[in-house]
Swiss-Prot record:
Compartment annotation: Virion
Domain of life: Viruses
This protein's UniProt keywords: Early protein, Virion
Protein name as it appears in the record: Uncharacterized protein CP312R
Native species: African swine fever virus (isolate Pig/Kenya/KEN-50/1950) (ASFV)
Induction info: Expressed in the early phase of the viral replicative cycle.
Entry's Gene Ontology cellular component terms: virion component
Record-stated family: Belongs to the asfivirus CP312R family.
Length: 306
């Protein structure tokens, strides 16, 4: 039975572990059981376990009401041409990797100077940031998981301690950027990967449309699968049209493994299932009404395709 930890419980456990300077009490890596990737034997995986409220399991957790920011780039040349013709001021490039959801640290932007990047300061010379109530809960979890991950690697095998650790959070503009390279982001970004099955070229997670509730055979409420205006289900070629900036998301994140490769050690956070709410009023149904703590498998199997 798959365990899905509640975001509130996971956040509390990680915060307490940080306060006590003991991430090992919550977060651990199963170094003794390295798994080799099927398609690339040079890539290895290590299972991530967390201990929350006395229960230990591979890490999967839910999130609710988180705002995606930014644009998902298109996957085809035709869409690149169309989008750039429609909006030449904001040119896009063809996507060369799996799409991602992006979440900011703060729900609202800090006040910025005219350059659009420098955070304004108060009379005491301190940068002005939104209060704790404006912090994304999901971002807080990811930031703490990053700390716990780095701590676990440093306490792991000697040959792992010298490897490059790939961060979960982007805090600076890319060094390759044409403008403001290496400058600190005023509102850091965390990304959740939407995996594409390389064999079927289909999206791995189940994506649902929160504006279209349905009733399953077991009487529970779910939603229709996310589709475009032509009735085509979300796929790698249309997802950039279906998930727009400022859409609201609920879902489940699969964070059960770290990955060891020639690039270093990474901690992939992948969307297991998601419910997308795009610019409509809240209909009063949240993700908790779709699944219980151990029902992800049943949910995926029981989704009704309208």
């Amino acid at each position: 039975m798959t365990t899905i930890f509640h975001a509130d419980d996971l956040l509390h456990a990680l915060q307490q572990a940080k306060t006590e300077k003991n991430f090992s009490s919550v977060f651990s890596l199963d170094w003794d059981k390295l798994r080799i990737a099927k398609r690339n034997t040079s890539v290895k995986y290590v299972t991530v376990h967390v201990m929350v409220k006395g229960k230990k399991a591979p890490l999967m957790f839910n999130f609710q009401n988180e705002k995606h920011v930014g644009t998902i780039s298109p996957s085809t040349d035709e869409e690149v041409i169309r989008m750039n013709a429609e909006n030449p001021k904001f040119l896009v490039k063809k996507r060369d990797r799996d799409p991602c959801l992006q979440f900011n640290k703060y729900k609202i932007s800090p006040p910025l100077e005219d350059d659009g990047f420098t955070v304004k300061k108060n009379e005491q010379g301190e940068e002005i940031y939104p209060g704790d109530e404006e912090k994304s809960k999901l971002f807080q979890i990811i930031e703490l998981l990053e700390e716990a991950f780095e701590d676990a690697v440093q306490k792991g095998p000697e040959n792992m301690k010298t490897k490059n650790i790939i961060k979960l959070v982007q805090r600076k503009i890319s060094s390759n950027a044409a403008k403001n390279a290496d400058k600190s982001l005023p509102n850091p970004i965390a990304r959740i990967r939407i995996k594409v099955n390389p064999i079927t070229n289909m999206l791995a997670p189940v994506l649902l449309d929160k504006s279209k509730p349905i009733t399953l055979q077991n009487g529970k409420t779910s939603f229709e699968e996310l589709k475009d205006k032509d009735g085509v289900k979300a796929n790698p070629d249309n997802i950039h049209k279906l998930i727009e900036s400022h859409s609201i998301h609920d879902g489940i994140i699969n964070a059960r493994s770290i990955c060891i490769s020639s690039m270093g050690i990474s901690f992939p956070l992948c969307l297991e299932m998601g419910v997308v709410k795009v610019f409509e009023k809240n209909n009063g149904i949240d993700v908790d009404s779709i699944y219980g703590p151990d029902e992800i498998t049943n949910l995926i199997n029981q989704v009704t395709i309208a």
